[in-house]
A protein has these predicted regions:
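Histidine-anchored nucleotide/phosphate-binding helix
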Residues: 202-212
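Ferredoxin-reductase
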Residues: 89-169, 225-226, 253-255
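Short, conserved phosphate/pyrophosphate- and ester-handling motifs at nucleotide-, phospho-/glycolipid
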Residues: 120, 199, 288
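Short conserved beta-strand and strand-loop elements enriched in small hydrophobics
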Residues: 3, 81-84, 123-128, 169-175
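Short N-terminal strand-loop motif that marks the start
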Residues: 1-3, 9, 68-73, 82-110
Length: 322
């Protein structure tokens, strides 16, 4: 089988993915998770049949245009591929970096002209000098002038450690990507938002968008962390709960706390026992992929239709440190 891409032709080995073939031939296609989640490796098919799995999770409009995930595409015949608009870069600048906790940074970026997104989506942040790229969810709402990211600080994290001193630096953005965003289908539909770690970032954007839209139905936001400090937006969430009677919050940590809303009960248990009619609710899950997969399955078994469960698992880079 042959793969045509940007004027070159490559031989595709038996069972090899399009991304592996292009990487082997140094074609310069970006990638991150290699599991079909981060959408870094989007390409467009100009000729050839697209395996269904290569378009799983993509917007209907993108599928219709022939977009595919190179990491998931193992074609049965020859293909001709091209880059697609979603991988186009937007120039931005880091305008503010501040700690939200010892392990989480708030990074604010200028919003490029014409950069439209929905709260809860994610971007690919690219460092121009060497092409280093990482996906981050947007914690800001679409009405805000600046883009806000919550970045987990990792000891050996190439991007996160660089961002500590990056105020004033030029960066590039790709996207937005993802379907984990607020859907104003009915103001009477309850919303459950549950996330671990910096999985709170997209949920914070979705929550505030719902409140700004006048969502009157019950809202539950649950955040899990390895310590009390890991509930890094607890004060902000508590303030919102005071202002909006329809909002209740809960925290899960391995230990007791003076705040009765924070307990040792697992995030999964709190979500399943949150008191909302799960079969009629719209649900958002973000963070640790094992948590997201497990709770998504449990919620489905509890009666929530899959098309009302929006999931955004956070994945580590494939085969390399952050």
């Amino acid at each position: 089988m042959r793969l045509a891409f940007e004027g070159q032709a490559f031989e595709l080995a038996e069972g090899e993915s399009v991304l592996d073939c292009l990487d082997r031939n140094q074609a310069g296609v970006p990638s991150f998770c290699r599991n079909g989640v981060c959408q870094s490796c989007l390409l467009r098919a100009e000729e050839g049949d697209i395996p269904a799995v290569a378009q799983q999770g993509l917007k209907e409009a993108w599928r219709a245009q022939g977009w595919l995930l190179a990491c998931m595409c193992r074609p049965a015949g020859d293909m001709q591929l091209a880059r697609c608009d979603a991988t186009r870069s937007h120039a931005a600048q880091v305008v503010d970096v501040a700690p939200l906790s010892e392990k989480v940074l708030r990074v604010r970026l200028t919003r490029p002209a014409g950069f439209d997104y929905s709260a809860g989506q994610f971007i690919q942040l690219l460092r121009p000098q060497d092409g280093l790229m990482r996906p981050y969810s947007l914690a800001s709402t679409a009405a805000e002038e600046l883009l806000e990211l919550h970045v987990a600080l990792l000891p050996q994290g190439q991007m996160s450690q660089w961002l500590i001193g990056a105020t004033g630096e030029q960066v590039e953005l790709r996207g937005p990507f993802g379907e984990c965003c607020y859907v104003a289908d009915t103001p009477a539909r309850p919303l459950l938002l549950a996330g671990t770690g910096t999985g709170l970032a997209p949920l914070f954007g979705v929550l505030r968008t719902a409140l700004q839209a006048g969502h009157a139905a019950p809202l539950r936001l649950l955040h899990g962390a390895a310590s009390r400090e890991g509930l890094y937006l607890w004060s902000a969430l508590a303030a919102l709960a005071v202002c909006y009677g329809q909002l209740e919050i809960g925290g899960s940590i391995p230990g007791s706390d003076t705040d009765a809303r924070i307990s040792e009960r697992s995030l999964q248990q709190q979500a399943l026992e949150c008191g909302l009619p799960l079969a009629d609710s719209r649900i958002y899950l973000c963070g640790n992929p094992d948590f997201v997969r497990s709770l998504r399955k449990q919620l489905y078994l509890a009666g929530t239709p899959l098309n009302r469960i929006h999931a955004d698992p956070f994945l580590a880079p494939a085969n390399r440190p952050d």
